[in-house]
Amino acid sequence: MSDPAVEVTPAVPVASPAKAKKEKKPKSDKPKKPKAPRTHLPVSDMVVNAVKTLKERGGSSVQAIKKFLVAQYKVDVDKLSPFIKKYLKSAVEKGQLLQTKGKGASGSFKLPAAAKKEKVVKKPKKVAEKKPKKAAAPKPKKAGEKKVKKTIAKKPKAATATKIKKPVAKTTKKPAAAKPAAKKAAPKPKAAPKPKAAKKETKPKKAAAPKAKKPAVEKKPKAAKKPAAKKA
């Protein structure tokens, strides 16, 4: 009897923890250097400002640009010269700057006319944006027009209400006004005897004054009795 064959699996190498630690050590050993804060603007902004302020018809040379940076920003041009050359090349390729003389990073540079036109056009755009905001003030007028429409719509309603009330008032007041008219007509015949009082006033009572004179005339003939003296 032959013994059955036994399968043997190969042993898998296990990474020791010491090796893993060795791999992490170099990462922790490298100290991070603190980045020094910038004391100036980016090179692109400084170069563009230099070309704008110099305003040379034939373009500003690299030397003129460097002198401007030293005077304006007080920068070490020797350290920034490679960055200046890189920006000039990329700016010419992108169309941000025009190279009037030389090739590559040497020669003269100026701003393209399209960039100047865009800057000039941007200013009126800002003014045009502000004007519609001021012109938007007439919006309250629309609200006023709505108010006028509402008031006009309400006026006919009030007119119809008054028209309905007027005939009702006329029908009720007419019989009431007729009653006092009859009452006033009754006292008119009572006023007729008033002329009688006027006739009494016209009687000339004072004209009867001559009656007082009659007794004076009657007394005079009584004095004629004097002839009685003849008897003596």
Curated annotation (Swiss-Prot):
Signal peptide: none annotated. It is found in: Nucleus; Chromosome. Residues 1-18 have a biased composition (Low complexity). Residues 39-113 form the H15 domain. Residues 1-42, 98-232 are annotated as: Disordered. GO terms for biological process: nucleosome assembly. The keyword Nucleus applies. The keyword Nucleus applies. GO terms for molecular function: DNA binding; structural constituent of chromatin. One of its GO terms (cellular component) is nucleus. Belongs to the histone H1/H5 family. Histones H1 are necessary for the condensation of nucleosome chains into higher-order structures. This is Histone H1A.
